[in-house]
Amino acid sequence: GLADTADALGPHSREKSLEVMRDSRIGTFGAVALWAVLTLKVAALSALSPHAFWPVLLAAHVLARWSSLPLARWLPYAQEAKGLGAGLASLIDVRGLVAATALMLLCLLGLVGLRRGLWLLGGALAVLLLTGLFYRRRFGGVTGDCLGATNQLIEALTLLIATHPHF
């Protein structure tokens, strides 16, 4: 998802960008994006204190995976040929999204507490909003690759926020 979305960011038309996402090969932008996000995650994880490592890692994972639900619910599916993201989008109704959000909040607060949870949630919501607006403008909606890219970006940002000395 992250690599395909990054590869689609080149100077392409919307149609060409979506075609690039369907291509199974990885390009330069995709390789650089994978390297950058993986390096950021490793650096952030190595900077976490031992007592915060597991709660923060789990909180990052919960937030990142939850982010697929509002994106898939609120944005149209961008590709003609239906992929995995289209199946997810068709399953999410408002009640399901509210229930998943409540469960995510319970997990987040149970793992890192209220103050830290609000910081992590704020970062995740900022990434969710910015990527959602970008996907709508650039691709006309969301794809499964976009959902995966947002997952990885939110996970990396969550880990980075948790390394702040006042976290």
Task: Describe each PLM feature range.
Residues 9, 13-16, 23-167:
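Hydrophobic alpha-helical transmembrane segments
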